[in-house]
Structures are given as C-alpha cells and as structure tokens.
Amino acid sequence: MSAERRVSREQARRIAIAAQGFLDPRPAPFGATMRHLQRVIDRVGVVQIDSVNVLVRSQYLPFFSRLGPYDLALLDRARDRAPRRLVEYWAHEASLIPPATWPLLDFRMREAAEKAWGSMRRILAERPEFVELVQREVEQRGPLTASEVEQALEHDQPRPTDHWGWNWSEVKRALEFLFWAGRISSAGRTAQFERRYAALDVPPPPDQRAAWLDRPGPEADPDRFLELVRIAARAHGVGSERCLADYFRLKREQVRPAIERLVADGELIPVTVPGWRRAWLHAEARIPRRVHAEALLSPFDSLVWQRERVHTLWDFHYRIEIYTPKHKRVHGYYVLPFLYGDRLVARCDLKADRQRGLLRCHAVTWEPDAPAGAPAALRRQLDAMAAWLRLEPGPVPDGRPIGNGSRAAAELSGILDDRGAEGHRTAEQSQGARALVGETDGRLA
C-alpha cells in the first residue's frame, strides 16, 4: 500500500483559501452582478445568518470579503425574489443555502419534534391544533411575517377579553417549529429582518418543487449525507473528519460512510496534514504556489467558523466575544479576523457608527511577526468596507501586538499617522442562534 500524500500546513492553508473563493477575480467596486454572487454561493455552499447589526448583518460580509464592495440589494434579491438562489434553513447554524440543498436536510426536519428547542417542542405537545392552524394560515395567505400571522388569526378568531389561549409568543414558537420541521419555509426577509414564512411550493424554483414537496424518508439519508459531505469537501478543499462533519453539523457516524464512498469514487484523496490524525483532499482542489489575498472576515465566515480548524492551519486562536461581559473581552465586541496572503494576521474590532457616518475601528491586534505589508493592506480593506457601507473611514488606533510583537504593529503607526490616525455547537453559537429566532427583539418569547 502506497504512503499517503503529505500536504504541509502552508499548502493546506492555500488550498482552503482557494477553495473558499478568495483567489477568484474581483469585479470593479459595486460592479458585482448576480453571476458573481452565484460564484460565491457555488464556492461556499452555506452562508451563516446572524442578526447582530453592529457593523452589518453577517450574511452580507462573506460576499464583501470575496467580491469587494457590492450592492447589498443583490443578496436580498437572491433571497427574496423568484427564482430564488438562496433560501433559509438550519444548515451550519441558521443559514442561507441553495434551494437544491434544502431537501438534503430532511433528516433534520424529521427530528424537530425531539430536538427543536424546548419552547418549540412544548407548543407542539400542548397545542397541536394551534400549530396546525398557524400552518394553514401560512399556506393560505402567505408569505407572512409572524406579526401578520397574528393579525390574521386575530381577524379570523378575535380574542375575547379573557383571551382564548394564544399570543404572539405562541404564534412565533409555532412558526419556528413548523420552519424547523420543514412544514413551511421562508420566502425572504423584510427590511426589518423579519422572516416571511411561506408554503413549501413558494421558495423553490419550478424544477425543484417536486424535491421539496415529495421527500423520501430515512432510507434516502445515506445519499443525503453523501451530498452534504461532498459540498463540504469541495468548499474546504482539504479537511479532517471533524471539518467535513461540522460544515452541516453532521455526526461523525453520518459522515464516515460518505467519506469512504467519496474516497472509493476518487473524489477524496487521503492525505497527511500536520495537526490532523486523518485528512482528505478534494480531487479538484487547487494547490496554489502562493496566495495574494486581503480580506476582513465575518466572525461567521465559513473559512473560520470551525475554530479547531483555524487553530490547526493558522495557529490563530479566535473566539467571538459578543456574549462575553465587556470587562472580560480580550479583543473587543465585534472582532473580524484579517486575512493577508495565506495568513490570519490581525483582529479588528469594528463598528458602523451610522449616526456620525463613520466606520469605527476600536482596536487592532496583530499576530506575532505579521508581515510588514499588512497594515497598508488592512487600511485598503477598511477604506473599501467604509465605501461599501456608505460611511467615511474613521481613525484607526495603533495596533497592539500579541506576544513579542510584530513588524506590522511597528509599521502601522507611521501609515496611520499619515491618514490622521487616532465543529460542535458552542455556547456563543447557540446564543446567537436563539437571538436570531427572536428576529428584531433578540428574544424568542
């Protein structure tokens, strides 16, 4: 038996960056078309949603990171208008996925009665007739927001003064259960980020409606897992079993047979990568000799959302501190990793100060030995982000280094003075997902 091919950590980083679309040509600023957006969708396969809006809602950022400044309405159109290129479901976390991927998650829909959050399970157990009523309202009158469903129920069956047992919280719980269970879907969002619930025949393109409406049972799950692992493997380029499982939150026992089938078919190649016990390379993955990339990354970008992978490939310790008390935060509230070349070289705590029209950078923390060219690249990306968000670029503080310091931190002060510078679900992800279900008020109930 021949020895497995060895892939260095540096090669693995470059493979991952290329697979995620960071080396594809960028259009001119604000020149991106739906074709460019589709290219990113095809590359990553999943875009995580998050309701935090301190900078911009997270689902918009992966497209900026790969395309540069683009019209945000382009993504809204891909999600909200037929033929939809993106629909919502629980994929990695709450996510935007291609309509063709939605039926592959049927196994998760069937688990809703047992695995949905407690308040959703309770509404099904205690008020099954009410859940059916809410489903009928959506199917007959949708797409509808939660508040519109409430208004429709109020019109059809007005509540007496002593109430007859339902309220907005129950409507929302019923809708979220039905959404999780795949009994209804989403036709997009309002400008206030409220989900527009819809019958299952509304979101998919005509050629995919049958796959949505007539889903095979558990006997088709092995093929579903195969397709999901195939998407993850292509999007990662190279990865461990945990990487491939985490992309769609699959279990190891669901992933292993799929990996074996893909290896047997020649789509995956077993390789040795330092830091992973076992790893697989996608047969069509590019292995660039060098990488010229500059990108500020969403905390929920698919390049960095699996923290063990980030630590293994980049030796970069990254945690989201949104839900960390202020006095315990290390790097800031909304911190974006900065990709330069094939390395993650800095963390930037950013905020869109819409009242003053400024993109604020509260802090920059540089990795040890960050390259000397990184500060100028960061300044370029901050300027591009400010233009994208229709803000002025605000002052940037001198970066503070980690450990023994960095050439980048030493260089940063001079550059900015010229500009007038002044895998498994973590607790942080669960909190974010629960806040997302609450939509605009950040609460489920």
What name fits each language-model region?
Residues M1-L297, D301-R309, F316-I320, P325-V335, ...:
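Long, low-complexity intrinsically disordered regions
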